[in-house]
Amino acid sequence: MGRVIRGQRKGAGSVFKAHVKHRKGAAKLRAVDFAERHGYIKGIVKDIIHDPGRGAPLAKVAFRDPYRFKKRTELFVAAEGIHTGQFVYCGKKAQLNIGNVLPVGTMPEGTIVCCVEEKPGDRGKLARASGNYATVISHNPETKKTRVKLPSGSKKVISSANRAIVGVVAGGGRIDKPILKAGRAYHKYKAKRNCWPRVRGVAMNPVEHPFGGGNHQHIGKPSTIRRDAPAGRKVGLIAARRTGRLRGTKTVQEKEN
């Protein structure tokens, strides 16, 4: 009998706790209020900061509270091209400039946006990773809905009252730079989660993994495995419908509708 394999140990583990010790806070849009719904409110970018475990930089934006004599600082996902000292305008009547926050229904078709709300008032859920953006495709004034194209390429119909930041998320091209050293990968995943290093099954001994052992590294058996296999054998391509490369498939032209 072999040892308890990695997949079994994982299933018996505790609930995941995010590594949030050095993080700067949750990046959100302003809570929607009367000033944003009917006009606009002005803020100033105080600082652009790095948040550990996140690819995109964050912008500290200071707003004067419209209801109390105090200032409020918000953490926005920084759009490409904003700078410290820049004025940021949030609201229905704000201008269409990089870094401003507007309802998607007021933006012309083809506008590039990021940190898009999925539901009105949820303060930004879509297109928030570094270099990502969504595109406003079309508006339906009768139903008050707007169609946007997400970074994955899928299209989503959302409410026209949903807000978004104009522009692309900063930090694009981050994954183009190779990691090169194990030390960099160590620090990267230390800030994110405990998932590194990951030893391959074929590099293990036979007691530690079904694919382990042998005079050279090879699986030595089919990598596909049935759905009802016991937990200690359930590794590889689980209940795969098909394997291998997609050969001879016809690329379908995407319809714009």
Curated annotation (Swiss-Prot):
It is found in: Cytoplasm. The keyword RNA-binding applies. The keyword Signal does not apply. InterPro entries: NA-bd_OB-fold, Rib_uL2_dom2, Ribosomal_uL2, Ribosomal_uL2_arc_euk, Ribosomal_uL2_C, Ribosomal_uL2_CS, Ribosomal_uL2_dom3, Ribosomal_uL2_RNA-bd_dom. Its main location: cytoplasm. It comes from the Eukaryota. GO terms for biological process: translation. Residues 207-231 are annotated as: Disordered. SUPFAM superfamilies: Nucleic acid-binding proteins (SSF50249), Translation proteins SH3-like domain (SSF50104). GO terms for molecular function: rRNA binding; structural constituent of ribosome. Pfam families: Ribosomal_L2, Ribosomal_L2_C. GO terms for cellular component: cytoplasm; large ribosomal subunit. Keywords: Cytoplasm, Ribonucleoprotein, Ribosomal protein, RNA-binding, rRNA-binding. Component of the large ribosomal subunit. Belongs to the universal ribosomal protein uL2 family. NCBIfam families: PRK09612.1. Component of the large ribosomal subunit. The ribosome is a large ribonucleoprotein complex responsible for the synthesis of proteins in the cell. This is Large ribosomal subunit protein uL2.
